[in-house]
C-alpha cells in the first residue's frame, strides 16, 4: 500500500474551477466516506483551503485508487472526469510525502511562506483522526508534515514579513486608498479569516469596523475583540449589507458561503447612496472567499476595485526571497529523505524478525532431535549446547541483518528485502503476521516518481497540468 494524492490548486486551476471543488467540513466528511467505501482504499483525509483541494489516501493499487478518488470528486463538483483531469495533479508514494511536507511549509501557497496553511493541515488531520479515517500511514506522514512546517518557520526567515493572503490583499487595498488609517472598513464573516483581517485592520489604525455575519453571536465576539484593541466596532446583520457598503471605504469578505454574498445590486445601491467621487474615494473590496463571495460583475463597476485570490498571487509582496525559499526547500528535502529512510528500515524489519524467528525455530527443532538421540544428556550439558548453537546462529545472522537494514534504507532497497525472503525461503504470510502483530511497525514506501493519471507509476510524469 502507498499514499496517493489527487489535488487541484491555485497553481493548476483558475478560481472558477476551485469554486466548483470548494468543500465545507460536512462535504469533506462525505467525500472521505465515499472514497473509503472502496475496499482498495484503507485511509483518507482531505485538505481543503481557499487555494486547494487535495485528497490523500492509502491505496492498495495506484490506478484503482486514482479512479475511485477521481470519480468521487467528479460527481461532487459536477465536472466530467475529462474536465477535472485538465486541472488536477497526482502524486504517488514518496512524491506524495514530499508534496505534503512542501504544502505544510508554506512553499506551495499563493503567498509563499504564509503560516495559515500549517494550521489548515493540522485541522484536516485532526478532523480525519476524529472521524477515524486515518491509520498508521497517514498518521505518521501528517504528524511529520506538521513538524517539518514548524521547523521551516523556526529555522528560516521565509515568513519574516508576516505575509498572508489577508496581509497582501489589504496591502493592495491600502495602496489603492492611499492608506488605511481612519478608513471605514466592513468585515463580512467572523471566522478565522475574518478575525485575521480585523487584526490587520486594527494594526493599520482604521477608523471603524462594521462586522457582518450570519451568526450575530460570533459577530459580537469579534466586534468585542476589535473594540479591545481601541478601534470602534459594531455589528450589522447581512440584511443591512447595502447600508454597510454605503458607509465603507474598504470591504473584506471571507464567509465560505456557497454563493455570492455581495451582489451586483448591493454594490449598485451602495454607490448610489454614497454619491461620492469615484476617483477620490473608490470602494475597495477584498474577496477572499472560496467560492467567491463577490459577484464577478462587481469588478466592472466604475469606482470599485476588487482584489481577489488571483490578484494576490500576482502581487510581488506575495513572494518570499529566493534565499529563504532555497533554505526552506533544503529542510524539506532533508526531512523527506529522513522520513523515507526510516520508512524503508521499518518495512524491512518484519522480514528480519521473520528470519530470526525462522532461525530460532530451526535451533529448537535441532535441540529436540538432540534430546531424542541423546536422552541421557545431562541438563547442564544440554543448556551449554543450546547456548553454543544459539550464539553461532546469532553471529551468522548479525552481519547480514545489519547490512540488509542499511541496504534497504536506500532508494530501491525493497529489492534487497525481497532477495532476503527468497534466499531464506521466508513465507510472505509469516512476514505479514509479524507486521500485523504489532511487534514492528510497517511504513509504506514505493515509487519515487510523480505520476500522471492513466499511466503506471514508473512511467509517469509529475501531474496532469504543469505547475
Curated annotation (Swiss-Prot):
The record marks 99 as: Important for activity. GO terms for molecular function: glutamyl-tRNA reductase activity; NADP binding. It catalyses: (S)-4-amino-5-oxopentanoate + tRNA(Glu) + NADP(+) = L-glutamyl-tRNA(Glu) + NADPH + H(+). GO terms for biological process: protoporphyrinogen IX biosynthetic process from glutamate. It comes from the Bacteria. Substrate binds at residues 49-52, 109, 114-116, 120. The active site is at 50 (nucleophile). CDD domains: NAD_bind_Glutamyl_tRNA_reduct. Its EC number is 1.2.1.70. InterPro entries: 4pyrrol_synth_GluRdtase, 4pyrrol_synth_GluRdtase_dimer, 4pyrrol_synth_GluRdtase_N, GluRdtase_CS, GluRdtase_dimer_dom_sf, GluRdtase_N_sf, NAD(P)-bd_dom_sf, Shikm_DH/Glu-tRNA_Rdtase. Residues 447-467 have a biased composition (Polar residues). Keywords: NADP, Oxidoreductase, Porphyrin biosynthesis. NADP(+) binds at residues 189-194. Residues 446-467 are annotated as: Disordered. Pathway: Porphyrin-containing compound metabolism; protoporphyrin-IX biosynthesis; 5-aminolevulinate from L-glutamyl-tRNA(Glu): step 1/2. Possesses an unusual extended V-shaped dimeric structure with each monomer consisting of three distinct domains arranged along a curved 'spinal' alpha-helix. The N-terminal catalytic domain specifically recognizes the glutamate moiety of the substrate. The second domain is the NADPH-binding domain, and the third C-terminal domain is responsible for dimerization. During catalysis, the active site Cys acts as a nucleophile attacking the alpha-carbonyl group of tRNA-bound glutamate with the formation of a thioester intermediate between enzyme and glutamate, and the concomitant release of tRNA(Glu). The thioester intermediate is finally reduced by direct hydride transfer from NADPH, to form the product GSA. Belongs to the glutamyl-tRNA reductase family. Homodimer. Catalyzes the NADPH-dependent reduction of glutamyl-tRNA(Glu) to glutamate 1-semialdehyde (GSA). This is Glutamyl-tRNA reductase. It comes from Mycobacterium leprae (strain TN). The lineage of its organism: Bacteria, Bacillati, Actinomycetota, Actinomycetes, Mycobacteriales.
Amino acid at each position: 500500500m502507498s499514499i496517493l494524492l489527487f489535488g487541484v490548486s491555485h497553481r493548476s486551476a483558475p478560481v472558477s474551477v476551485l469554486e466548483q471543488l470548494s468543500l465545507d467540513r460536512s462535504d469533506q466528511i462525505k467525500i472521505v466516506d465515499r472514497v473509503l467505501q472502496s475496499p482498495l482504499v484503507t485511509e483518507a483525509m482531505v485538505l481543503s483551503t481557499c487555494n486547494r483541494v487535495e485528497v490523500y489516501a492509502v491505496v492498495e493499487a495506484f490506478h484503482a485508487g486514482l479512479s475511485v478518488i477521481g470519480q468521487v470528486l467528479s460527481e461532487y463538483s459536477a465536472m466530467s472526469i475529462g474536465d477535472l483531469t485538465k486541472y488536477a495533479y497526482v502524486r504517488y508514494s514518496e512524491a506524495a510525502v514530499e508534496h505534503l511536507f512542501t504544502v505544510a511549509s508554506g512553499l506551495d501557497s499563493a503567498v509563499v511562506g504564509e503560516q495559515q496553511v500549517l494550521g489548515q493541515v493540522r485541522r484536516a488531520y485532526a478532523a480525519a483522526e476524529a472521524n477515524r479515517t486515518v491509520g498508521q500511514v497517514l498518521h505518521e506522514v501528517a504528524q511529520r508534515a506538521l513538524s517539518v512546517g514548524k521547523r521551516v518557520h523556526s529555522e528560516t526567515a521565509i515568513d519574516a514579513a508576516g505575509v498572508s493572503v489577508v496581509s497582501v490583499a489589504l496591502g493592495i487595498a491600502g495602496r489603492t486608498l492611499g492608506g488605511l488609517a481612519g478608513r471605514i472598513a466592513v468585515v463580512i464573516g467572523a471566522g478565522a479569516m475574518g478575525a485575521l483581517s480585523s487584526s490587520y485592520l486594527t494594526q493599520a489604525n482604521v477608523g471603524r469596523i462594521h462586522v457582518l455575519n450570519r451568526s450575530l453571536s460570533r459577530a459580537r465576539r469579534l466586534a468585542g475583540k476589535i473594540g479591545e484593541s481601541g478601534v470602534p466596532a459594531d455589528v450589522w446583520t447581512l440584511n443591512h449589507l447595502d447600508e454597510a457598503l454605503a458607509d465603507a471605504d474598504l470591504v473584506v469578505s471571507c464567509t465560505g458561503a456557497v454563493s455570492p454574498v455581495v451582489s451586483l445590486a448591493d454594490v449598485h445601491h451602495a454607490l448610489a447612496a454614497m454619491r461620492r467621487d469615484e476617483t477620490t474615494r473608490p470602494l475597495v473590496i477584498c474577496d477572499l472567499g472560496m467560492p467567491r463571495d463577490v459577484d464577478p460583475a462587481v469588478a466592472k463597476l466604475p469606482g470599485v476595485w476588487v482584489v481577489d485570490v488571483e490578484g494576490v498571487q500576482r502581487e510581488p509582496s506575495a513572494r518570499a526571497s529566493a534565499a529563504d525559499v532555497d533554505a526552506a526547500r533544503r529542510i524539506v528535502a532533508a526531512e523527506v529523505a529522513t522520513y523515507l529512510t526510516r520508512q524503508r528500515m521499518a518495512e524491512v524489519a518484519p522480514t528480519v524478525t521473520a528470519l530470526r524467528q525462522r532461525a530460532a525455530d530451526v535451533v529448537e527443532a535441532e535441540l529436540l532431535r538432540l534430546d531424542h538421540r541423546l536422552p541421557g544428556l545431562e541438563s547442564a550439558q544440554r543448556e551449554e549446547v543450546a547456548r553454543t548453537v544459539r550464539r553461532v546462529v546469532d553471529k551468522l545472522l548479525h552481519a547480514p541483518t545489519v547490512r540488509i537494514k542499511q541496504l534497504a534504507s536506500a532508494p530501491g532497497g525493497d529489492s534487497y528485502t525481497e532477495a532476503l525472503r527468497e534466499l531464506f525461503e521466508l513465507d510472505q504470510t509469516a512476514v505479514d503476521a509479524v507486521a500485523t502483530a504489532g511487534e514492528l511497525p510497517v511504513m509504506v514506501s514505493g515509487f519515487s516518481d510523480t505520476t500522471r493519471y492513466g499511466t503506471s507509476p514508473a512511467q509517469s510524469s509529475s501531474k496532469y497540468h504543469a505547475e
